[in-house]
Amino acid sequence: WFIDGEKIPSMVGTGTEDFFNTSWCPKEPFQSPFFGYPRVNGETGWLGRTHVYRFFITDPVFFEKSLKATIEHGTSNDMDLDIATVAYWYQDKSYPIPAIPNKAERKLKPLINFWHIHQMRQAWKKTKNNNAWGD
C-alpha cells in the first residue's frame, strides 16, 4: 500500500490468497462479515471467475490524500489477471466523481476455460526458454 504519495509502500503483503485470509486458492464459496469468497471456480482455483472481498473494519488503512493498493499474484508476481476492484472510504467533504462507464462497458467478460489456461502457460514458458520455472 502506497499511502499519501509514498515512493516505497509502507504496507507489503505476501500475495492474493493471504490478503483475502486463505492460502492455496479458495476451492469452495465462503462468507464472513469481513472477508469471503462468494463465487469460486473450484476446478481452476483463482482462474476463471472468482469473487472475493475484504473489509478493513477492524484494521483500517488511514490516509489523507491518496492511497494506491497493489497485490502480488503468482510465483514471483508473474501471473496476468483481469481484476476489477471497488473501494469504499469515509471522507469529511464531498467532491464530484467521474462518470461510471455505460452498461455495455461494464458487462461481464467471458470465462477463462482450461484451453485458455493452457495457452497462457505455454506462452509464459516460451518467455522462459521453455523452462517451467524460468532461468
Predicted feature residues:
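Beta-strand-centric surfaces of beta-sandwich/beta-rich domains
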Residues: 1-134
